[in-house]
Amino acid sequence: MTKKKAATNYAERQNLASEDSSGDSVHFKDFIPLQELLKDKNYVPSVENLEKILYNETMFNDQKICSNLLLEALIITLFTTISGKSALRLIQTSSLKERKSWAQSFENNSSSYASIVLSWKDNDILLLKFLRFLLANKTAPLQINRYNLPEYKLPLSFLIVSKITIPSILLNETYNLLKDYLYSITGRIESLISCSSTFDKPALVVRKILKDYNRMIECRNFYFWYSFNAENRVNLTFSDNISLLMENDEGNAGSGLDDSRFDHQKQPREAIMGRTINDQEQIYSFELNQDGTLEIPNVMEHSLLRHELLFKILNLTTVLTPLLELQFSTLCGLVDPLMQPTPNDKHIISIDFLFQLFLGLMSQSIKTSQEHNDHYDWKFYMCFNMQKIIDATMLRLNCFDFDILNSVNNTDNAVHWKTQLHRWLPHGLNTQDLELLYMIDILAVYTIYKLYEKIPIQLNPFLFSLISLWKNLSCVILLALEIDRIEEENGTYETPLMVRATIRGAAALRSVIATVLNGLVKNNDHDFKHESLNTFMSPYGRKLCHGALYADLRSHTASLLALGASIEDVTDLFADLQSGDRFDEDIRYMFDYECEDYDESFSESDHGGLDESVVNPTEKIASGSNNVFFRRRCNCIFNDDKLVAEDGANEAFGSTNSENVEGAMHNNRNAVHNATTATSDHVVTSPNPLSVRSRSTFEFDYSGEDWRDVPRDFNMYYSPSYSFIHEPKLDVIFSLTLRGATEKLNKEESILLVRSVASCVRNEQDQMILADLESNFSASINGDVEGEGNTKMSKIDNEDLRRTTPDDIYEIWSEESAFERMLNVNHDVAWRLMDEMLMCTGYRRILIWFLTHLELKHSLIYYVFELIMGLRGKPFSGEASDQDKKDDMIYEILKKKQKNEDASGLPFSRQGPIVLSDIETKMLLQEFFMNAAIFLSSKNNEEENEDGEKISLYSLGLVRLICYMVQTLIANDKFFFTKSECTFELQTLLMTWIGILPEAKDLFFKIKTRLAMEEEDSADTMQHEGRKNSDIEKKLNAKPASELNLKLLNLFPSKPANKDDSSPINTLRSFIADYSFDTQVNPPGRRVVFYDGKILPLPKADKPIPLHEYITLAELDVGDSE
């Protein structure tokens, strides 16, 4: 009996739905817009005015107005609001089976509920009230499943006509009032809007209503414009008709709204897919057609198919909005190396150039979208779609959740790093697609910046997302670097290819984001305008962009809070965010094999027939790391570009035989050879090469930094009282060095060993001077007049002087590990030997690297300290004034002994203390602190104290000694925080020990305080200079900057009464009040000394060959072979 009642109720619902549509055709036929009916009330079609009309129930009494109001309210509410689309989604998903099961669920009290359903029959007033309810909640989706709760059903109590049944229905939590009402009116809604073709009367009316209310965009295929959620699209039986209707509108009104289903390229793509599936061999083979023509696969079409598949793989179809697919396909086409434009003499396919192309290709679609929406902010909407693409790619690249990324631990010995790869590496992508996605994100981030470049980055609407993305990418890079370090330490070198590809792409994208957040895009215009995107992807292709954050993040934090972000979200965002990292150096080391690929050498023949006027002047700029020249397509000059010596300056240390020089450069690109490696007939060559590692003609860069690898000041002069050995023997040096590594040497043996090494270095320096003099002498006289006797005597002397070289000594130290072993037995002798070797031209940086990578010992710390303090060598007496130096020299000449004897009894062969350049000092400290941190970390893992904690007592002593050393350097002004590049390494070293050693804690926070103070001082100085030298443009920009500060202050949460001013918000409020948005960041590293926007022509080797020329050359080659 109950089943029969349920069936009866279901039948009543069906009858009600079918009867609801009886007069709908009449409604459409006699439709009159409300704008005409309410002309006397000056009604203007808009959502706000429509909502006011619905609240005026006196309008419902007029049948003519009521019927037309119902149509307009139904179209606008259901198809252009979020709440209405929630109702439509339920209608679309409610199948016949679901409705039947819903009716059967109310077997009890069925008569009362049936009466409710009957009360809804032909009740337009209730339907209008329901549409009013939806319109009042137009910006929020309906949580339909919760409308069984009384608090949710109460606003819908107007649907219950009988006042007696209201309490029982509202309190019945098993009954969903909203769902029952929607099921009841489903049939009527479907019949009301249905149309058999796009040109039926109902369809035309729908289109007119949407256009009058300017809601065509919101209705378009039921998309959610500003939503990151994967909303399910509503596909009712009439949705395709409405979509087609808008596509066929006059003037192609919807052509710019991007519906891929009606794209003109759809047919070719389907043809490609069908051909690929049915005949896969066509991809790999070429077959003639029946007419004899050759059909070759279309690379462009296959790339289009690849981009379409990526769009689906990224799951962007679930968040599809107008222009989204068009933007994605345009980005793919521009960044894909197979489809992007080819470079020419006027353009470089740079990031900035691709951005301009992107805007040009999207301009027509943007204009069309603006025609349909008066309030359309195309910049924000373009960037909003870009953010959707970035989020989708990061999700696919497994770089979306920071908590998951931060929980991965590759250094855990109990878990192998390979078992953790699935947690942070992408799945189902090859390296080409991975790099393509990162390229897409790079152009997307740059677009977000460029469209809002007129305002400070702190006010960019997508600032929060950019910082979050940078944070995730930094975590991914750290994980990848850990794996590469582990493999290098184990000697296996099996870093997976996907890990290398991930770090390559992530580092490139991170550098763009960091440049944007640091406000350095204009400073780094060279990278964005003069380097191609493919070059930019390499760590060596990016000449200026850093991946680290150097900006004052307090301004970003204050702006986020002022613009509405919650304090909890901002706190989570900036937690675990480490600015000023040095990942870029590790990445360059990881990809060192790419260095020569992006610093390619060139020869004079590369210029071809070009005039000297069109040859790039910077082609004569030497690479900082190689003795080659590389070609740039711009006139930009960097501060570390080496100044090339002119004319005779090169010849002083060069060769008159150009062929020998070119051969030497080819054989050893990393070593810059001295003149004696390739001399003319006037200077005799020898099979033993000199130890020179850097050419002395490239001495200073454009910022004035001294890059010479030579002894300095008085170290160039020999001590008058020092007794050199004319012919030092290699076997004596070899035997004494090996003996000193195992047993204690007596004083005579120690002095003999030191004198032999000093003599080798001195002989090489003399030979270099002789070569210089010989070259100058040969250039000034006629070579025919030279006497053979002088030449032969020079040959004999040179052969004697070159029997033993510093190369031989360094080889013994390195291969036999003799030096490191000697430190355990004869450390005084070993360090004096190091002093003498540091006088060798070209070996100083090599020796600095060598000694900083030795095992950390107390004597090593002492030696580094003495080097920096100027206590090594032979310090002058007194205050080291000019008079003191003269007195010491006169005393030594007259007395034949040094005035200040060394405590070790091992005299120094040169004059004065050992002097290091700023570059050498920075290198010494940076390498020392970094390797000390690595050594101490490994030492702690090997030893445990009595409590079982991994703390080495030996390490405690070393760290305490390092702290004392740094404190002394600071006190003597030998450690400059702003100029030093080793601060990060020192902080990393101290970080582990601040909770163990009080000295480490005091030093760590002292460094942090001094850094903050000096940054503030430098900022104040920059602001003072900026105010002093400000031009008219800066004066004009001063007013908007102050207005921005005032606006942000007004947007801050109001100050609570009776509260102190110590809260973070009040601190940030005070900070932002005086903050200047023109503040510039000064990151370390390379800088542009001269920037020129001119693009130079392509090198001849890089120019594409025309097809007819290629065929001609091919025919000539075939003819020659025959």
From Swiss-Prot:
Function: Acts as a component of the CCR4-NOT core complex, which in the nucleus seems to be a general transcription factor, and in the cytoplasm the major mRNA deadenylase involved in mRNA turnover.
Subunit architecture: Subunit of the 1.0 MDa CCR4-NOT core complex that contains CCR4, CAF1, NOT1, NOT2, NOT3, NOT4, NOT5, CAF40 and CAF130. In the complex interacts with NOT1. The core complex probably is part of a less characterized 1.9 MDa CCR4-NOT complex.
Further facts: Present with 1320 molecules/cell in log phase SD medium.
Biased segments, Polar residues type: 11-24
Gene name of the record: CAF130
Modified residues (Phosphoserine): S1042
Organism: Saccharomyces cerevisiae (strain ATCC 204508 / S288c)
Disulfide bonds, paired cysteine numbers: none
Record's subcellular location: Cytoplasm; Nucleus
Stated name of the protein: Protein CAF130
One Gene Ontology term from the biological process aspect of the record: positive regulation of transcription elongation by RNA polymerase II
Keywords: Activator, Cytoplasm, Nucleus, Phosphoprotein, Repressor, Transcription, Transcription regulation
Primary location class: cytoplasm
Residue numbers spanned by region Disordered: 1-24
GO cellular component: CCR4-NOT core complex; cytosol; nucleus
